[in-house]
């Protein structure tokens, strides 16, 4: 009874801490292009979201659920970020309870301690994108796969299928991760428990059938990626090393990759020696997902970046939690625990710092300076990204950019540069790269001044207001 009370106190204490943390991170106002895209998508109807998303490179479930969640709040940025935090909170609450039941309270509590602080997932904890939802889908798929293996109950199969579909409809590399989980469960059934083959086949068929409505869009998106230039850079040995370092420490302290890497190898040896199948199979999911992404990128076309592995983060932390909970030596256990918690907590400072407004960040005050402009002309190198951020702060003034999203655009006021016609305009706001004057070839007879230099997510830009003089 005393142990149960201690577990309950720790469980709810961690949940309170995590809830406060996610609510705090959701206060961030530092928006980047992909988040602006999400916010522009929400006012559209569900049918329009399906159509627009089909022309993009992601499935639609995140936008549907985000629209429903934020509807009472007027599609606010805070509500959208909070939706991501809620998904992470569910992972934490369900994971802590179920992992404690299945693998012992020590494993469950370590999962709860480490997952909110894991920098790779923490960096996306309140991001207005689909990574939190896809993480939830992959985690549910894996959790119910294990429950199916133990108990073979119908509702566990339903949970397994629901998790797989949530992953598949949220992000394509979450789909890959779910496919790996389905495949690993099949292999285990063939080797050790053939009575599970029939329900596996039935619920796999159900999964495929329920994915059929999106399958045509998925195939068309794959064909587009295969036949057109895409923004993802080729993977090299150097970039792969950088990606792995980023996975280990995100944007935090440099010592973290060494600490976490060495501990990970130690846990791998320990769990392999004890033949602990569940955490080893859990680790196989991100490893195989990463390997497939790198292989396709190397052989066909670059399609993978390291943040696409975020949906597998709960499984990585489950592996770590299993490893540390099996350390027998009290001295070694204490040292390992201190290293992990210190390293993770140190990175927490960087995540919290990110919610602070960027110095000279482009925001509504910047667009207010140019409120007399009849149009924005984007002449920055990253015109596709900058135009989306500008549209978030001013969704009424026409914005013209060299690169646009075409049919995949949810923005009401972004147009291709070919449609720019300044003949009837008296004032135009021009955005250029920092320290770069406007190109006046498209604005004959215009002169003006620079209003300021701003940080628009990853780009430093100059904002100019030009007025017709002739």
Name each region found by the language model.
Residues 1-5:
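Short, Lys/Arg-rich, polar N-terminal cytosolic tail immediately upstream
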């Amino acid at each position: 009874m005393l142990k149960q009370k201690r577990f309950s106190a720790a469980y709810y204490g961690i949940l309170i801490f995590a809830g406060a943390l996610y609510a705090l991170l959701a206060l961030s106002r530092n928006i980047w292009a992909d988040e602006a895209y999400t916010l522009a998508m929400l006012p559209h109807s569900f049918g329009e979201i399906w159509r627009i998303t089909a022309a993009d490179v992601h499935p639609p479930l995140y936008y549907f659920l985000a629209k429903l969640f934020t509807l009472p709040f007027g599609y606010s940025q805070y509500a959208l970020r909070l939706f991501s935090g809620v998904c992470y909170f569910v992972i934490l609450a369900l994971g802590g309870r179920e992992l404690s039941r299945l693998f012992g309270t020590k494993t469950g509590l370590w999962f709860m301690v480490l997952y909110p602080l894991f920098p790779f997932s923490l960096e996306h904890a309140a991001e207005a994108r689909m990574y939190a939802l896809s993480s939830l889908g992959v985690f549910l798929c894996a959790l119910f796969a294990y429950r199916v293996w133990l108990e073979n109950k119908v509702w566990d199969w339903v949970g397994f299928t629901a998790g797989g579909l949530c992953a598949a409809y949220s992000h394509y590399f979450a789909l890959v991760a779910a496919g790996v989980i389905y495949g690993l469960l099949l292999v285990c059934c063939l080797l050790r428990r053939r009575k599970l083959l029939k329900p596996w086949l039935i619920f796999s068929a159900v999964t495929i059938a329920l994915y059929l409505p999106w399958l045509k869009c998925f195939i068309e998106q794959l064909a587009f990626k295969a036949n057109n230039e895409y923004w993802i850079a080729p993977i090299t040995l150097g970039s792969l090393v950088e990606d792995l370092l980023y996975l280990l420490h995100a944007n935090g302290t440099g010592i973290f990759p060494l600490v976490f890497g060495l501990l990970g190898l130690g846990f791998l040896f320990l769990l392999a020696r004890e033949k602990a199948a569940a955490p080893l199979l859990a680790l196989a999911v991100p490893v195989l997902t990463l390997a497939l992404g790198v292989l396709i990128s190397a052989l066909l076309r670059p399609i993978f970046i390291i943040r696409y592995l975020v949906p597998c983060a709960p499984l990585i932390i489950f592996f770590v939690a299993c490893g540390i909970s099996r350390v027998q030596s009290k001295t070694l256990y204490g040292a390992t625990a201190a290293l992990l918690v210190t390293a993770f907590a140190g990175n927490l400072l960087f995540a919290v710092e990110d919610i602070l407004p960027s110095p000279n960040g482009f925001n509504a005050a910047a667009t207010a300076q140019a409120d007399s402009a009849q149009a924005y002309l984007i002449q920055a190198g990253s015109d596709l990204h900058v135009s989306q951020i500008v549209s978030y702060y001013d969704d009424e003034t026409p914005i013209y950019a060299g690169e646009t999203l075409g049919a995949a655009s949810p923005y009401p006021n972004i147009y291709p540069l070919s449609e720019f016609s300044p003949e009837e305009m008296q004032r135009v706001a021009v955005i250029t790269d920092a320290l770069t004057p406007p190109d006046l070839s498209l604005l004959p007879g215009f002169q003006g001044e620079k209003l300021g230099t701003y940080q628009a997510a990853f780009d430093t830009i100059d904002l100019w207001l030009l007025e017709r003089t002739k």
